[in-house]
Amino acid sequence: MGEFQDVDKYISILKECKPLSESEVRDLCEKAREILSKESNVQPVRCPVTVCGDIHGQFHDLMELFKIGGNCPDTNYLFMGDYVDRGFYSVETVTLLVALKVRYKDRVTILRGNHESRQITQVYGFYDECLRKYGNPNVWKLFTDLFDYLPLTALIENQVFCLHGGLSPSIDTLDHIENLDRVQEVPHEGAMCDLLWSDPDDRLGFGYSPRGAGYTFGKDISEQFNHNNGLTLVARAHQLVMEGYNWCHDQNVVTIFSAPNYCYRCGNLAAIMEIDEKMKHTFLQFDPAPRRGEPHVTRRTPDYFL
């Protein structure tokens, strides 16, 4: 029990939406790096599991998610990235998820999203928030260095393939993903970039993405990929969907988005997907948590709603 005493203390502080000290974050990130560096690019996950999409610093809504989905470690969780940026509590959100990973490493899987990057966080809020809360960029650096170790994808019972963004013209099989060197900043192009940036589309084949990174991919691509790899489903996040989840490509792909009323103004529901021991899935939708006024922050972050 002794080894987790500190982490239990961190978790109880964080659950009150209070940030840890810089030295506590350093300690936590060292422990997390040790765990994440042993995980695979396609991290195996057992069912039952609850699959979650983007959180984007909406801490109170993450608390609501745990209320609805169950607490760690009672529920086995898989998060598909984008913990930071845009919301007001990126620091507390990402620190809590990393602390839960360290405390319950076999019951929490955290993947990398396109926002878990040095470049993106300098534009969309996490960097500025770290500066505001700590007075220097050290905590931002600790986390962005840790992000390089996050697994890119997960595979539930060899059947459901989970990742932040989508498919890539450079990747036909899961073995290709296993062979990538993931410990680096998210590149501007190539397989690793595509996994974190691509989106499903109504047009067939691969197309250029309006995001300027990754590709769009059609139903033919999803069907072929699932067939080649013996998969029943690709589960991904990365796109705001008004009901919190959205099927496409003849149920070969599902998008899950777990930040309700995204950016405190989009009016969307959030959802999580529960997969039971028989691999049957159920979606739980939820509204934003009631919040007492937001901190006064001048927003310098550009809006991109893609």
UniProtKB/Swiss-Prot annotation:
Q: Which GO terms describe its molecular function?
A: metal ion binding; myosin phosphatase activity; protein serine/threonine phosphatase activity
Return the protein name: Serine/threonine-protein phosphatase 2A catalytic subunit A
Organism from which the protein derives: Dictyostelium discoideum (Social amoeba)
In terms of Pfam families, this protein maps to: Metallophos
Q: Looking at the UniProt record for this protein, which Gene Ontology cellular component terms does it annotate, in alphabetical order?
A: cytosol; nuclear speck; protein phosphatase type 2A complex
User: Which InterPro entries does this entry report, sorted A to Z?
Assistant: Calcineurin-like_PHP_ApaH (IPR004843), Metallo-depent_PP-like (IPR029052), PPA2-like (IPR047129), Ser/Thr-sp_prot-phosphatase (IPR006186)
Q: Where does the protein principally reside?
A: cytoplasm
PTM comment: the record says: Reversibly methyl esterified on Leu-306 by leucine carboxyl methyltransferase 1 (LCMT) and protein phosphatase methylesterase 1 (PPME1). Carboxyl methylation influences the affinity of the catalytic subunit for the different regulatory subunits, thereby modulating the PP2A holoenzyme's substrate specificity, enzyme activity and cellular localization.
